[in-house]
């Protein structure tokens, strides 16, 4: 049986850093990964760019995490966003600040983050083994003594770190193994729920908006027709629904509301800088300005091209209809695309 001081299960970002830090303290460390290489999911996160951290203060971080955010105060007091940036700077990866307080590697390549973490672990003499799935713990007197791999090999250690991640992306190795392993040790597992995920909608017109990106817009999540939360930023339409930074942020909230059998809608404000009166005044000005020209021409000043056709169909506006023929009732509908 092979024996080390520390065994880390899972070679994602957390596992690589935990293994490297433990090794820096003089410990012999074995890092075990079931996939063919470390940090597969990290290499594709942020559309391949890797959103490393955010510039928000600690209170906003805690708030965004949800109901159990206070659990993170202790960890964040020891290692927070500035520490993260400094950590990667020391590893040779410079980061840049973008809209929304998001930090990305200057290269816009998540592989730079992955390679830096692997190098960090290896430079500190961490032994990494891949294609090795942990299937069981061996315990004596309520203490873990060793782990058993799927191939039958066993490894013992004084300390064990479970860093398997969640179950968000099975192809990358995130299949929920950690829940099963923790449960086998007697831990109670709270039912996981989706977070940071796209949303699926049955609205047929969304298919016409596939790949449309909207920036500097505001979305409102409506709970039983009442605003539950508002966010400013960007979204993207897909063939199945919605995605993008704002959608990923509110997805956990929406799932919780749906679990409570609430009625949930998303409202998108394309002109958040204008209140209803200002927007109404602008629409009237545009209609008057375009006069005998087709409504479609006027709409190009207000809406992305891809939205115009679905909008006209929804509001029964004919292609031949001219601006001067739009009555007040139809004009008011322009406020709620």
Name these PLM-found stretches.
Residues 7-9, 32, 134, 147, ...:
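Short hydrophobic core segments
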Residues 36-38, 44, 59, 188-191, ...:
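An anion/pyrophosphate-binding glycine-rich loop and adjacent beta-alpha core
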Residues 49-97:
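Glycine-rich active-site loop/strand segments that organize a redox cofactor
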Residues 1-14:
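Beta1/beta-strand and adjacent pyrophosphate-binding region of the FAD-binding site
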Residues 72-80, 99-119, 169-173, 204, ...:
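Short beta-strand to alpha-helix junction loop
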Residues 7, 23-47:
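Glycine-rich FAD pyrophosphate-binding loop
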Residues 130-143:
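A conserved short coil-to-beta-strand element within the FAD-binding core of flavoproteins
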Residues 155, 159-205:
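Glycine-rich loop(s) and the adjacent beta-strand/alpha-helix scaffold that form part
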